[in-house]
Amino acid sequence: MRENKKKPPLVSIILNCYNSGEFLKKSIKSVIFQSYKNWELIIFDNCSNDNTKSEILKFKKIKKIKYFRSKKFYSLYNARNLAIKKTRGSLISFLDADDWWSKNKLKKQVKFLEQNKEYNIVYSNLYLFNEKKNKISLFSKKKLYNGKITQLLLDDFKMPILTTMLRKKIFYKYSFDKNYNIIGDFDLFVRLSLKEKIFSIQEPLAFYRIHYSNMTTKKIDLHISELEKWFSKNNNKKKFKNYNFSNIQKIIKTLKVKKICKSGDILKFFLEVFKRPINLLNLKYILFLILPKKIIDRL
């Protein structure tokens, strides 16, 4: 009698995009050429007005690629939630339109989750691609976190969404906060880490494209606003009573100093930096005055 082999789980890949026609081809091809073949690609086009649609339609003959175009513009994390509702797989991964994966990304993460049923989330290291210098560097040179990692995420968030794979059942209970445009993955993964053990694969399995030109004052303002909202909402919650939020405050202050440096307002800079006694962090901020703006964006 022939033994029935268990069918490998279907991985639903969510690719959210908005005016991303320039980069989509590389991203989509990195999915098509995965060594793991049981996947579906859900492309959620957030009402793009460039050549995004025409680039996606070049792949229309591939039945595993499903294209959905929204009738109106949504916040990024609302769009992610809407895309999740389109999925059929038992496993979920995320890939943004300007990034891409190594060919064994899905295979290695599916294997881990199949062999370790007590885990519902796995992520990995990645490579940073500097498009201006055409240079690749490692994202984290330190060992990534494993297990119960809530405080580690609060102290140094190193869980890039494009490296993650999650069991879909997580999204029956949890979702992205649709009010965020920048920190929605941070918010979700911190909430999940309170309940879930999380495993990291140390090998880099993805490539993240750095766009320095995107670090606008408007985007910095939004980042500050969202972190302040998150801090205010969660700082006094019972579930976080044993956790330290001091690093969130440091990030907020650093973003404020960056914004002032970009504006060139020296007086405002010193008033912001020296609100508190001099420390090593304040001395670091003073370097911002010396460095070119394009370097500040990278820090």
Feature names for model-found ranges:
Residues 92:
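Short aromatic/hydrophobic "clamp" motif used to bind/position activated sugar donors
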Residues 104-137:
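Conserved donor NDP-sugar-binding/catalytic core segment of glycosyltransferases
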Residues 22-25, 50-58, 100, 104:
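Acidic helix N-cap motif at the loop->helix transition within catalytic regions
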Residues 70-87:
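Glycine-rich, basic loop-to-helix element that forms the pyrophosphate-binding segment
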Residues 1-32:
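N-proximal low-complexity "stem/linker" segments adjacent to membrane-targeting elements
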Residues 85, 124, 143-227:
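Conserved nucleotide-sugar donor-binding catalytic segment
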Residues 30, 45-54, 72, 96:
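A conserved acidic beta->alpha catalytic loop
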Residues 1-6, 187, 194, 207-299:
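C-terminal subregions of glycosyltransferases and related glycan-biosynthesis enzymes
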